[in-house]
Amino acid sequence: MTNISLDKLVTESRNENTKNIDRVETLEMLKMINDEDKKVAEAVEKELIHIAKAVDKIGEAFFNGGRLIYVGAGTSGRLGVLDASECPPTYGVSYDLVRGIIAGGQSAMFKAREGAEDSKKLCIKDLKNINFGKNDILVGIAASGRTPYVIGGLEYANGIGATTISVTCNPESEMSKIANISIAPVVGPEVITGSTRMKAGTAQKMVLNMLSTGAMVKTGKVYGNLMVDLKATNEKLVERAKRIVMQATGSKREQVEKILKETNFDVKLSIFMIESSLDKIKAKEILDKNKGYIVEAIKEIS
């Protein structure tokens, strides 16, 4: 356990603006919460340089066969699992490429297991169980920046030569000193003292959105602002796939449906086939050569 006392942590300090939140009308209470929430995006903005460095490292790792692994406890762990779980349906990647690990295991997603966060060894064990290696990226998430479970993971990852990133909401935390890249949006005291699921959790979610989205953009999973590697696994996504191809190419629905059927709903390939007027085999060959970047593939045939 780190020797940083809780009373020195910004996330544990008392918010002067909400001291009477229990004595006001409902609307005023919600205005207090909303006013505090407005500070979150500004805090994240101040960390954009560090977030950009992290995104570049993650994209580089993906190209080298590495993965993005989130570790955290409680709310922080759940946010990592949430972000990771959205990547496969959105970007068509494997469930192994971006993974979230929460202290205490799967059951901790639904029922708090607070004691699990106090063990450094537990995180090391969890990382070994997924064969975490030096080509992978470890993102440690903890509002306080002092959670032993996460610190143990960062120390282990550093020890094997992997890139480490910390996402905290306290300046100069122990985690920020351990990680190769520190991202620390300081959102100030919480509306309810110490309830870091609120502003700190929102800030962490915003940062994780940027990390995963940025890395996917950097690795060709997005064309314009369209998710061209999504998997059409249900009716909503089938319809979205059609709309994406129509928006990207300006083609009529009938043509798009025909091409998507031919490519087995490979959105990216369908777009490039229409844009290039190439058959499926040749279009796939050029796309693969350009690592899935539609823009680069179009340049090659221009």
Curated annotation (Swiss-Prot):
Biochemical pathway: Amino-sugar metabolism; N-acetylmuramate degradation
Highest taxon of source: Bacteria
Enzyme class: lyase
One GO biological process term: amino sugar catabolic process
Keyword entries, A-Z: Carbohydrate metabolism, Lyase
UniProt-listed Enzyme Commission number(s): 4.2.1.126
Catalytic reactions on record: N-acetyl-D-muramate 6-phosphate + H2O = N-acetyl-D-glucosamine 6-phosphate + (R)-lactate
GO molecular function: carbohydrate derivative binding; carbon-oxygen lyase activity; ether hydrolase activity
Residues annotated as catalytic: 86, 117
Pfam families the record matches: GKRP_SIS_N
Domain SIS per the UniProt entry, residue ranges: 58-221
UniProt function note: Specifically catalyzes the cleavage of the D-lactyl ether substituent of MurNAc 6-phosphate, producing GlcNAc 6-phosphate and D-lactate.
Record-stated family: Belongs to the GCKR-like family. MurNAc-6-P etherase subfamily.
HAMAP family with a match to the protein in the record: MurQ
Quaternary structure annotation from Swiss-Prot or TrEMBL: Homodimer.
Note: A lyase-type mechanism (elimination/hydration) is suggested for the cleavage of the lactyl ether bond of MurNAc 6-phosphate, with the formation of an alpha,beta-unsaturated aldehyde intermediate with (E)-stereochemistry, followed by the syn addition of water to give product.
Protein name: N-acetylmuramic acid 6-phosphate etherase
Gene designation: murQ
